[in-house]
Amino acid sequence: MLGAALRRCAVAATTRADPRGLLHSARTPGPAVAIQSVRCYSHGSQETDEEFDARWVTYFNKPDIDAWELRKGINTLVTYDMVPEPKIIDAALRACRRLNDFASTVRILEVVKDKAGPHKEIYPYVIQELRPTLNELGISTPEELGLDKV
């Protein structure tokens, strides 16, 4: 209510009536209205690495996840400046298998390789950790499919 009253006062102060009774904008500015600056801080607690991993594993382990939610989760995960932990990738690959979405499994593995960037030891480590899951689900790596040469 105070904000509305201040706006009404500011509008009234910036208009004047001429001799015919018509309202016109005043040539001089009205009284200055104090604007309070607000700082936007994140007051929430920081998410730990374990909580982050658990959140994404839970997301991909949803039994009723659909293809759109899967792609949305993968795309969101890709935007982070990090390589996902193997347990997150494992959950995502299992979600792909539940949906029979082979293309997404290959895309996930390609993204992991791309996110590793110049650190050549990360991708082989992730594949080594995921090898039992890849064998269980019958998923081939992009290298096994020959996609790394394309």
From Swiss-Prot:
Q: Name its pathway.
A: Energy metabolism; oxidative phosphorylation
- Which UniProt keyword terms apply here? Acetylation, Disease variant, Heme, Iron, Membrane, Metal-binding, Mitochondrion, Mitochondrion inner membrane, Phosphoprotein, Primary mitochondrial disease, Transit peptide, Ubl conjugation
Q: Positions modified as Phosphothreonine?
A: T141
Query: Where is this gene product found?
Result: Mitochondrion inner membrane
Locate the coiled-coil region(s) and give their ranges: none
Q: Which family does it belong to?
A: Belongs to the cytochrome c oxidase subunit 5A family.
Question: How would you summarize the oligomeric state and partners of this protein?
Answer: Component of the cytochrome c oxidase (complex IV, CIV), a multisubunit enzyme composed of 14 subunits. The complex is composed of a catalytic core of 3 subunits MT-CO1, MT-CO2 and MT-CO3, encoded in the mitochondrial DNA, and 11 supernumerary subunits COX4I1 (or COX4I2), COX5A, COX5B, COX6A1 (or COX6A2), COX6B1 (or COX6B2), COX6C, COX7A2 (or COX7A1), COX7B, COX7C, COX8A and NDUFA4, which are encoded in the nuclear genome.
Q: What is this protein called?
A: Cytochrome c oxidase subunit 5A, mitochondrial
Provide the species name. Homo sapiens (Human)
Q: Which gene encodes it?
A: COX5A
